[in-house]
Swiss-Prot record:
This is Spermatozoon-associated protein kinase. It catalyses: L-seryl-[protein] + ATP = O-phospho-L-seryl-[protein] + ADP + H(+); L-threonyl-[protein] + ATP = O-phospho-L-threonyl-[protein] + ADP + H(+). The keyword Chaperone does not apply. It comes from Aplysia californica. Its EC number is 2.7.11.1. Residues 299-351 form the AGC-kinase C-terminal domain. One of its GO terms (cellular component) is nucleus. Keywords: ATP-binding, Kinase, Nucleotide-binding, Phosphoprotein, Serine/threonine-protein kinase, Transferase. InterPro entries: AGC-kinase_C (IPR000961), Kinase-like_dom_sf (IPR011009), Prot_kinase_dom (IPR000719), Protein_kinase_ATP_BS (IPR017441), Ser/Thr_kinase_AS (IPR008271), STKc_PKA (IPR044109). SUPFAM superfamilies: Protein kinase-like (PK-like). The active site is at D167. It is an enzyme of class 2 (transferase).
C-alpha cells in the first residue's frame, strides 16, 4: 500500500492543537499550586480501586451539584515513604494537575492532611473499555476507528508534553457518559528528557525495544496503540503465551497473523504500527502521528470533529439504576483515619 499522503489541513489543525496544549501544560506545570482543601469537605461513597499504598474512592463535594462525583486517589504518607515513592508521588501530582487533553483523565485538585495525600480526579462513570470488549467479544470496525482516533490523539498529546505512557490496555481506558474515551492509570513519575530503559507495562502490550532493553524515550508508544487496535477488532491480542519468556520471544519476532475478516487497510496499518524497526514504525517517522491519522483505514474518521466531541459515539453507556455496580468491581471498604500529628511534614511540604 502506498505511503500516506500528508494533507495540509490535517497538518495545520494538529500543529495548532499541539502547540496550544503544550503551552497550557507548561504554564500549569511551572506553577505547582499548593491547595488548602480538606477531605472533610467531601463525602466518601465507595471504593473504586485499591493499590499498594492507597485507594481510589468515589466521592462528592459538599458545595457541588449532588449529582457530580469525583474519583479521589488517597495515598497514605507512611506507605509512600516506606516504599520510597516520595519523589515519584510529588512529580506525579505536578504532572497530573497540568494535563488538559479531552482524552486523558484530569486531576482537578490535590491536597494533604497529617496522614494522607489526596488527588481529586474527574470521575469517568461509563466503566472500562475492557468490560465493553469482553461483553461484545469484538467490536464493529466503525467503533474501532472511533476509539482508536481518540487513543491516537491522547498518546500524541502525552508525547508532545514529554510524557511517556507505558501501560496502554483496555483496562486503563474509561468511557464517559457520552461514550467517549479517557486514558487513565498513568503512573507518571517524571517528564522524559533523553532516554529511558525501564521495563514496565502489561506484557502483551510491551514494545520490542522495551524487551530488548533498548532506549525508547524518543518514540511514543505507537506499538501499544497497534496492539490495542488489533484487540478491539479481533477480540484478542496478536501475541500471547502463558510463559512470559515465550511471550517476549513472540513480540520480538513480530510475526503478525490476521483474522480473515481484517480488511487490507487494517492489515496495512497494523503492519506499519506493530513494527520492530522503530525507524519504519508509523508515528515515529517524519510525519509523526499524521501517518496514522491520514491512513486509509481512517478515511471515514473526522479526527477534528472527534477532538471537539461533536461526533456521536457509536455506543453510549446506560447509566440508569444500578450502573455503579455494573461498571465497577466491588471492594472491601476501609475507613479513612487521620492522625493528630504529621510524621512527615518535610517530605510532602510542597504537595
Amino acid at each position: 500500500m502506498a505511503h500516506n499522503q500528508v494533507f495540509p489541513e490535517s497538518q495545520k489543525w494538529l500543529k495548532e492543537y499541539l502547540e496550544s496544549s503544550l503551552e497550557q501544560f507548561e504554564n500549569l506545570f511551572n506553577k505547582n499550586v499548593i491547595s488548602t482543601e480538606s477531605i472533610r469537605n467531601y463525602t466518601l461513597i465507595r471504593t473504586l480501586g485499591s493499590g499498594s499504598f492507597g485507594r481510589v474512592m468515589l466521592s462528592q463535594h459538599g458545595g457541588d451539584n449532588p449529582q457530580k462525583c469525583y474519583a479521589i486517589k488517597i495515598l497514605n504518607k507512611e506507605k509512600v515513604v516506606k516504599m520510597k515513592q516520595v519523589e515519584h508521588t510529588m512529580n506525579e501530582k505536578r504532572i497530573l494537575l497540568s494535563i488538559g487533553s479531552p482524552f486523558v483523565v484530569r486531576c482537578l485538585n490535590a491536597f494533604k492532611d497529617t496522614t494522607n495525600l489526596y488527588m481529586v480526579m474527574e470521575f469517568v462513570n461509563g466503566g472500562e473499555l475492557f468490560h465493553l470488549l469482553r461483553k461484545k467479544g469484538r467490536l464493529p470496525e466503525y467503533w474501532c476507528t472511533f476509539y482508536a482516533a481518540q487513543v491516537t490523539m491522547a498518546l500524541q498529546y502525552l508525547h508532545n508534553c514529554s510524557l511517556l505512557y507505558r501501560d496502554l490496555k483496555p483496562e486503563n481506558i474509561l468511557l464517559d457518559h457520552l461514550g467517549y474515551l479517557k486514558v487513565t492509570d498513568f503512573g507518571f513519575d517524571r517528564r522524559v528528557q533523553g532516554h529511558t530503559w525501564t521495563l514496565c507495562g502489561t506484557p502483551q502490550y510491551l514494545a520490542p525495544e522495551m524487551i530488548l532493553n533498548r532506549s525508547y524515550a524518543s518514540q511514543w508508544t505507537t506499538g501499544g496503540l497497534g496492539i490495542l487496535i488489533y484487540e478491539l477488532n479481533a477480540g484478542f491480542v496478536p501475541f500471547d503465551h502463558k510463559v512470559p519468556l515465550k511471550l517476549y520471544e513472540l513480540i520480538v519476532e513480530c510475526r503478525l497473523t490476521f483474522p480473515s475478516f481484517f480488511k487490507p487497510t487494517l492489515r496495512d496499518l497494523l503492519t506499519n504500527i506493530i513494527q520492530v524497526d522503530v525507524t519504519r514504525r508509523f508515528g515515529n517517522l517524519r510525519n509523526g502521528a499524521l501517518d496514522i491519522i491520514n491512513h486509509p483505514w481512517f478515511k471515514d474518521t473526522d479526527f477534528r470533529k472527534i477532538l471537539m466531541k461533536a461526533e456521536k459515539a457509536p455506543w453510549v453507556p446506560n447509566l440508569k439504576g444500578q450502573w455503579i455496580h455494573q461498571t465497577f468491581d466491588k471492594w472491601t471498604e476501609e475507613s479513612i483515619s487521620i492522625s493528630k500529628h504529621d510524621k512527615y511534614p518535610d517530605e510532602f511540604s510542597n504537595f
